[in-house]
């Protein structure tokens, strides 16, 4: 029964990934059609991410009241309706309003399912969970790139994503009795959760450092996701559909990285996988910084996705091991808020810099985030080693 539930959770994470890569891929076509400056894309991203941060911080209370299954099903349905609304939007303002339910839904799904899997499943299953998120963010730009070249355009891409998301939401509602059965069985084995405030969490050694790691890793992810296509169009002189096709390399690399992390987790520790991911990203940053042709940019984007994607699930899985199962829900909620702060702040600043200095700043910006990530990993390993934790 727990295995069947895990499969359903995997489908829920496909639904979590679907909206995340759509907007960045579609934005060049949207701002061209609506006659908008490309930096306005940050406004939609900000609203969406503020919703996600808010729901992440309050998710432990919501989930405690209604249960992970119900919250996940309702949140997925909410994001499906928002995707339909995007496809019907004729101006910029509706996109901003529709970004609110997209963000709120994503925060509850992300926090609830991450803590659930971190407590009850293996590190391999955690990485595979995020691999399915990778499938979601790979499917949507692929579909969008195909539909951008047709008469349906970006609206058609959002409609297709809506139907996929709606199907996942219906699956979650139909299988709610299964969630209730498994929840009743696991409740006897779970450690009673403590709800801690941000102030209390900040006093725990290592928690603030983990916030930095999530902020930097997710900053790299969101900047590449949201501005990768614009970088290719504005700086590499590609068309919108060409850029969308190149961005598929990033999302394929992202998904492959999560898959390989799940396979390697049966033999290697989380920390070893994290160090391998950072090494792969280092190669990607060098390639991206060099003035090389478009084919090399595709390779660099692929390696950024493959190297960065294992970090989030492994950082998350380590949470109850580093800080204790009793406070893991609160810590993970704060980490999801930190990650979404990265999703919010990093692309916003990149968009503003790109508007003033050109999108050629993107490789330098990503490299700066990468350096902060390396320093953060070194520091948290030192803290955990001092606390007697195994960092091998």
Question: What label would you give each PLM region?
Answer:
Residues 35, 67, 88-93, 237, ...:
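Helix-breaking motifs and short loop linkers at transmembrane-helix boundaries and internal kinks
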Residues 54-93:
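Conserved MFS/SLC helix-loop-helix module at the cytosolic interface between two early adjacent transmembrane helices
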Residues 98-132:
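Cytoplasmic helix-loop-helix junction between adjacent transmembrane helices
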Residues 23-24, 205-248, 252-255:
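Extracytoplasmic gate region of multi-pass secondary transporters
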Residues 323-359:
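A late C-terminal transmembrane helix in Major Facilitator Superfamily
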Residues 55-67, 257-269, 354-355:
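Helix-to-loop junctions at the C-terminal end of transmembrane segments
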Residues 268-315:
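C-terminal transmembrane helical hairpin of 12-TM major facilitator-type secondary transporters
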Residues 156-174, 363-379:
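Symmetry-related core transmembrane helices of the 12-TM Major Facilitator Superfamily/SLC fold
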